[in-house]
């Protein structure tokens, strides 16, 4: 079963259609560029409005910054510090929608088109970005791809013992179907420009998939905050010293919390955690040498665990005498509860580690920050490491 999602926007005197085709096993994005005489007239007003907005933006001293996810947004706000009043900062995923299911609107694309700084993760879920950037009105825009910034620190998805893989039969069917049409390969032509993003395309070339959840490492966060600071210093040189000072101070806070995590793990007798859920915390556990077991990989769309997966994880809880079974935020806890019910003691705590994939703008207004979530996660993690 597939869904076709179509939206149009005006750019360079033409009406463009972005067609997003989503299958169960993955996402495929196709850009169809047509000059539609029948609908151009209907979009003339929109085109004029866009042009006016772009012109107005040049006369507006406020920086225009667009981020996709909450961690990026919060990092930007910390680097801006008391200069935040001089910037309009947008978080596209502001209603708690998961990165993996996000569908950009025409308004989102237009906002990106004229911004000064655009920040996105750069994984498989962001395949729509490449086409969006091709339509950018502001050719001086600075773009930060988190996964590109981290380079070799980016990790491949891994399927470990006991973890349930994707439905192979369904995947094979969709894979074959996706290659039935020549137009599905139009995106190959889009790779000519010199700002290709390696991590975005590796999984197409060799079927390697990279773990997108890079923000869940405090070490990665330090690197990325520095990149954001350097970008802001280029865009707004008059406030460069302030941005550097703010970034240095914030990075100091990230380092301090990183040390707290390390100390907690070093002092723990148990260094294994188990998730009755998908597992987006690969970067975090690797930072501190923790072992993990989980029902699904981090980007899995699976929601029902097999009998074999439940049995394996239940036995692992018994074998290691694990006191906690984890889930991630906003998820059904039935798998974790079923694992516990199949253990010998049936008394494990079901706790949540927050992967920051459902943070909304209202949460931000209520004081949620990247550091506050990571501090809370540390408190919860300590429960499991006793």
Where do the language-model regions lie?
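Gram-positive cell-envelope targeting signals
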Residues: 1-62
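Extracytoplasmic metal-acquisition and chelation regions
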Residues: 37-38, 51-386
